[in-house]
Structures are given as structure tokens and as C-alpha cells.
């Protein structure tokens, strides 16, 4: 194995010419913590129905606290027919019974707060379920008071649903079409109607009064605030979503949302913006709009590339107006271990070091810390995701064989990353005593929390060590970049806060020997970096 001696003198303060803006000690709490995303059906079941619930999740708060998690993002848990696992809300004021009662939620929130853990909830404001009372009233007649809560037209344009097929559904009761940018059972709200805006304000205040610490707003740049008549252009036989997203007026809608949330002190807003283009993301991030956007700079990378990782990191630093979000996995993406780590535990550790030491707000997807992997459906009946089911059915309609359709369904299904949390090697991975709502990965006996807690060389132990370090070091929470560079297959950066500097070297290439500057204190790693190893060291008061 080759060695290459590098002296990182550019990290030394004496050679520094940069004058970074310092962050004061009153920085918002969300800048200093790492979030953990819990996909509601898949974390911990307490009653044997095969679906996670608040009682089960409460029983796992000690685990999250010991891991070093300071924030939790909950995917939707409101009453829903679950066409899209809760992203189709039927009642904004009720807990879905499969997750427990309002008392169960209140206790979960209380116990999380006792452990110093903030909780934000997913809020879907682009559409509701067609089971929602508002929609049921809306479709009764053209002059119903709820009619204009949704978008109804005599003739549809050419817009396509993001789940496949057309975006308009004919309703024979009133002889008009309603808009659904996603599934036909998820009708888009009309944000040009002041009554809708007032309803949303009431919903937000209800949950803020409950003590929720903030919201993650789903597909926030999809809100209908303008034109629904102009056709989308077609390029190379594929529709370009030009006029159905990022409409004029969305910023005003978001400013109303933000002003409502701001009535309550110290609350956090993050929006999912369906784009990986920085110029689109930055339109929605400001003190008057969203605190941060859930940007897909890392999440959109489909194959491992040091060059791409560095370019995205550099792009976020140069172009984002404030803190970016840092994440690799989510309920919409394939698992990190499959997509970028390619089954390599050491690379997964290096990628963890990247998002937990870089500038930004990190989000860890449940199970990522133990290296959970994708699942694949073996039959159509094993597909749970509406998107996967739709693409299967479209393939069959187009004349493809069942096997070809299953391949299409699996390719487009988001089930890959939604399998139950793997707690131990007991039946059903310790997730449930009943039949799980979705298949459990067959590798749970080898990949689980209990096993990795007993192994100091495990991926879980690395995540825990990194989180403890991040929680301790203000520089890793609030520090600005002094240096951000790539050398061969290494990503190197220094973050600075007040008089302190912490340097990070992540080696994705061949073995490297590092000569540290005088007075450097190693926080993690060592100065002989093998492939996929990292080094974190501090320089104080120089």
C-alpha cells in the first residue's frame, strides 16, 4: 500500500488569511444539534399490531439520548387512510389511532423534552386526503362553502402527477376535475383562498400550543398559489414540471406560515423543497421564510463520488444564504449503505464523519447508524408504497410482463428504506410481537442495535462517538469554514469559532500519513489514515 506524506500547514492559524464571520452564543438551538428522522410506522411497536406507535417510541428515547440525539423529526402521525403512509391527512387535529392516543403523544413529547430532545413534526400543507371533511364538503356542489378549498376546473391541462399518470381527476357529482399532484386520493389545497390560509394557521397554532418545537413542511414549493391553466412543456418525450411547482406567490404563503410559527418563541421551520438546484432552494430560506430548507445536495447523489461530495459541499457553502441541511438518507431515498457506501462499513463511517462535522444541520435517518440496508419486494403484494404500486400497474397496462412490472415497481418504490428498525436478533428484530406492516430485512440477525452496542469497532459506536464530540464542541456546531478543500481523494476543512479551530480530514483514497501542526490535539482518529478513515483535531488559541 502506498504512502503519501502531507503537511497540512494551511490549517495553521499563522498561515490563515481568512476572516470568517463569527457566530454569537445566542445562535438558535437548531444550529447546534443533530436530528434523527423517525419514519412513524417503522420504529417500535408496543401493542403487537405490527406498526410503530408513540408508546413504543417513548420506550426507545433512552437509546436516542445515549446516542447523542438532540432533535427528532417525526413523519406524519395525524389521522389518515394511509394511501401514502400519512402524507394524506384526513384530520389535522387527531392522532391516527394506529399510533396511539393524544395522551400517548403528549407523554412522548414530555419524555423527549425531559431528556433534552426537541421534537419537530411533518406537516403536509400542499394537499389533504380526499377523506378530509373539507374535501367531502367541497365535492358536494359547486356552491358549497368548501368548494374553493381545492382546485376545480371544467377542463384539465396536461399536468402529470408526480406518482405517475394525469394530475386531474374527473368527478361526476359536479362534472368538474380536481387537481392532485400526487395520488388521486390526495387533493391539492387552494392557497389563493384566504379561508384555506386561516385553516392552516389554526392547525399550526394547535400543535404549537401542544409544545411541538417546530415543523418540517412537506413539498412546500408545490403549493398552488397561481396559474393552473398553462400546459407544462414536453422535452424528449417527458413532461417538464415547470408551471406546477415554484409558482408565483409561494413565498408569500410561506411568509404567512413563518409569521404564525414565530408567534411562539424558539420554534424551528424546515421545508422540503423538491429540487437539488441551489438557486431554487435559496428562494425559500430567509428570516422571513424558512429557517432552513431540506436540500437534496447529498440526498440526490445516486453513486459514490468524492468529487461530487466535495462539489456539493462547496456549492452549499458558496450559495446557501444560511445553514444548509446535511443528510444522505430519508424515507424517499434508498439507504445510504446501498447507495453510497456500497456495503462498506468503513466508508459509511467516513460519510457519517462528513455530515456530523461539516457546517450545517445534520439529519440521520433511523437505522442509518447501524448500517441498515434496502429491502426488495419479491411480489406485487409485498409492495406497500403507492408510488411503487402505481409504476407496477402502469407497466402492466403498457404490456410488460409481471416480472418486468415488478422490476419497475421496485425501481420506483420508496419501500426500500422503510423496513422496521432492527433492534436485536430476536423474532421480528425486536420491532414487534405481531406481523410487521412491511417486511423486515433478512440481515437483521447480523445488523442490529444490540450487537453493535457490544462492538466498539461498529458503525453505531462511530456515530455515537461523533455525536458526543459534536455535542461537546461548539466549533462543530456553530463554526464557520476557514478552509474547504479537496486533495486527491481526501476532503479537508477547518471550522473556526471564537479562538478555536477544529480541522477534519476524511480520506476516501489510499493510505495517507498526516503531519499535524504544532500544538494540535487529536479528538478522533490518528495521523495514519487508511482508506475511508478520518481525523479530527483541534488547535486552540493560536
Language-model-detected regions and their locations in the chain:
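Acidic/aromatic-lined carbohydrate-recognition and catalytic surfaces
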Residues: 21-205, 209, 222-275, 421
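Active-site clefts of carbohydrate-active enzymes
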Residues: 233-241, 323-342
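C-terminal beta-strand-rich structural cap/linker in extracellular carbohydrate-active enzymes
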Residues: 526-542
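Substrate-binding cleft/loops of secretory-pathway carbohydrate-active enzymes
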Residues: 129-139, 262, 268-302, 372-386
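Core domains of carbohydrate- and sulfate-ester-processing enzymes
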Residues: 136-176, 301-317, 397-441
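Sec-dependent N-terminal signal peptides
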Residues: 4-12
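Loop/helix patches that line or flank the sugar-binding groove of alpha-linked glycan CAZymes
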Residues: 242, 261-264, 268, 284, ...
